[in-house]
Design a protein with these regions (language model features):
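Short, extreme N-terminal segment that most often corresponds to the first beta-strand
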Residues: 1-30, 162
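Charged interaction segments
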Residues: 31, 37-164
Length: 164
């Protein structure tokens, strides 16, 4: 069975109505974290719509479709109740236990832990602690979130329309 998600995990409270105005529909993960599904088309489109330019500083990423537009920083700032929101951008691409995962963790505009390579390391940095044989990934239920929601499909067409 496959596992393919790309998302932002935001630490702390956020404005749900404002988030939804950006097509960010939160899923509570526990540990004060909320998951928002995104993808590279989503981030490119919001970069265009917000008029931002540039890329986030990423480390240890070997994926050409990992979202890295500066618009993501601005979206997190806009919906978070913190002046410098903490969040991780994560990505999985597995099938039958083989594949890749990537994660970077941020405090607003700063890559907060350039050594973080895995989703578990990013989640640990955001405060997830294990209490059993489960790792951080499974403690927050990411193992049960196996694919992207259908609403993101529109961003592929929008990216073409916007030329991004």
């Amino acid at each position: 069975m496959g596992h393919h998600i790309t998302a932002i995990n935001l630490k702390g409270n956020y404005d749900e109505k404002k988030a939804e105005s950006f097509d960010l529909f939160g899923k509570e993960l526990g540990f004060g974290l909320t998951l928002f599904h995104i993808d590279h088309y989503y981030s490119a489109c919001w970069q265009y719509k917000l008029g931002t330019a540039g890329m986030i500083e990423l480390f240890n990423i070997n994926s050409s479709i990992f979202p890295c537009e500066l618009a993501l920083e601005e979206l997190m700032k806009s919906i978070s109740d913190k002046a410098e929101p903490q969040y991780a951008i994560i990505q999985t691409d597995y099938f039958g236990g083989l594949g890749e995962q990537y994660a970077n963790v941020f405090k607003y505009k700063t890559n907060d832990n350039p050594r973080a390579r895995t989703i578990n390391e990013a989640l640990y940095h955001l405060g997830v602690r294990t209490k059993s044989e489960l790792d951080e990934f499974d403690m927050v239920g990411l193992g049960g979130i196996r694919s992207q929601p259908e609403f993101l499909e529109k961003y592929s067409d929008l990216a073409d329309e916007y030329g991004v």
